Every structure is written in C-alpha cells, then in structure tokens.
Amino acid sequence: MKFRSLLSTCCSSRSLNAMENSWHDRQDNEGFRVYSYNELKSATNGFSAANKVGEGGFGSVYKGRLRDGRKIAVKVLSVEVESMRGEREFIAELTSLSNIRHENLVVLKGFHVDGCQRYLVYDYMENNSLAHALQGVGENRMRLSWQARKDILIGVARGLAYLHEEVNPHIVHRDIKASNILLDHNFMPKLADFGLAKLFGENLSHVSTRVAGTIGYLAPEYAVSGHLTRKSDVYSFGVLLLEIVSGRATVDFDMDRGEHHLVQKVWDHYNTNELVKLIDPTLDTNIREEEAVQFMKIGLLCVQENTTKRPRMSVAVSMLMRETDVKDHKISQPGHIIDFMDIKMDKGTSST
C-alpha cells in the first residue's frame, strides 16, 4: 500500500511523516495493521444501515465480518477538511490507542486512510454498550445482576485509573458515559472512543479546550469553562456509578417539573439517609442493600463540587473493592449544572 499517496491530498508533510513513522513502528504490534477500503466495505456490506451500530460526534460505527470470520467494528471518522481537526484528532487517536493495552480498554486493531476519509478498526463487542443494556426497551434491555454491575463498575474504574495514572503522558478521556462502555461476550467492560481524548504532560495541571462530552455526565467546571483535568473524568465516572446502581437516567426531562438531575436526587436522599430508596428495583433479591448504598456514597465522593476532594481513580478502585473504607472520606456538596444554558461550547462541538 502506498501510504504517502493516500495521505498527500489532506495531510501536511510534517503530520504525514509523524503518522508514517508511528505506523511503521507499530504495524506488527499484536496484529495492528492497515486495512484496504475493499476489505472494510466487504466486511460491513458496503457500510449498510443494517450494519450501523452507533453514531457520535466523531463519526459512525459499523459492525463487520472479515473473510477469515473475525468480527470487527469500523469507525468512520467525520473529517472537516477546512479546519483539519479531523486529521489531528485521527493522528492523536491512532498513536495513543495503538500503544495502549489494558483489559478494560478497547484495542485499536488497525486503520485505513482514503484521501480525506479515515477509518479505525476495533474488535467487535458482542454485547453492545452498557447504555444498550441499561436503557434498552423490551427484549433489548438486559437484566444485569448486582454482581454484573459491580464487576462493570470496577472494570471501568480500573481502565480509567490506567489512563490517568499509568499511561505517560496521561490521558483524559473527556466522554465517560454508558454508551462509551462496551461489553464483550463475558460482559467485561471496555472503555471506548478515545477520539475525544487529549494527551498532555505531567507538568500541566489542566488544559482549556473545547467542551466535548455528553450533558448529564459533564463535570460543571468543564462544561461551563472548558477547564479540564483528570478530576473531570472522575466526576463523569461518579455519575455513571449512580446511574448503574439506581437504574435511572442522568437527566430526566419532565414538561411539568422541568429538568431533573440524578446527582441532585441522590444528594437529597443522602441528606435524609434514604439512599436505599434509589436502588434499582429491577435488581435481584440477593442484592446487599448496604453494599449498594456504599457504592452510591462512592459516587457522591466522585461528583463533589470541590475538585480537590474528588478521589483519584485508583482510590475509587480501592473503595469499590472494599480495600478502603468509604467512611474515611467526608462527602461534601456535589457539583451539577443548574442551567444547561450555562454550558459554553464552541461552534461545532458535539454533545452526543
């Protein structure tokens, strides 16, 4: 494959060289390789609507099957040629993901570049996303046991802790939500969509950038000002935790009552010592209510308004594993967005 000829129309020579060198360094790394367009087109039945399994701010995702029988997921990135943001984001995602290996992270298996079009190839996750399991209707909704939910939360926390504390430079995901948690055939959770991730060195405490993420999970300081740190991910994880334990949406919209925020509801029940009332009623009867309540308290620790009081993800893992007592940490007022109109997003920023 003539790598340079495919990229020359849209990539600067500097970016092209960086991508080429990165690819050549990694092409034999655990099967990571370049796919031809015909391979991906054939695998996805011509990127048919029937094979489409997801869509977000950075593009659409299709399921496919290669000639050898292996199932894959293909993400077709949306590229804005004028701004070239697509190219930079593609390179960042490619170079970071192809070098990351953790059991709770989706692995990038390869890519294809066709002029200004970029395609990323991943392993296909048999059980779709956590959002599909929690929010599906009728037969599409899975009845996840309490043990399954615990395992999912611990897995997600471990994946985030790896990105925050073991990858150098560390990675802030920026879009932790149920639809970005994929479940394999054993329901092991895999963090997906690093197209929204930013890499920055340890000497930087934060990076101000365009807001990317989903309303309901966004940390207030990030949503309003674009002030981004690892603690922004911790907040989003806390919301996800509350969502999984309660089985409730992060934000409910009611014509009569207006916006209803899960974080505020949990905080209100915490103050009246009634957290047990928020445990998902569809959970099996074998659930230990005390344990579920402790999990919700961990969620509240993660969504505290004061970012310095939010635990690091490794500490959250320790608490979820009951290696650290939640009682050792005082829970303070949570942060939440009072008015969605306060969110300052640059033009073109997606909220999907």
Q: Where are the language model's segments positioned?
A:
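Conserved eukaryotic protein kinase-like
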Residues: 3-352
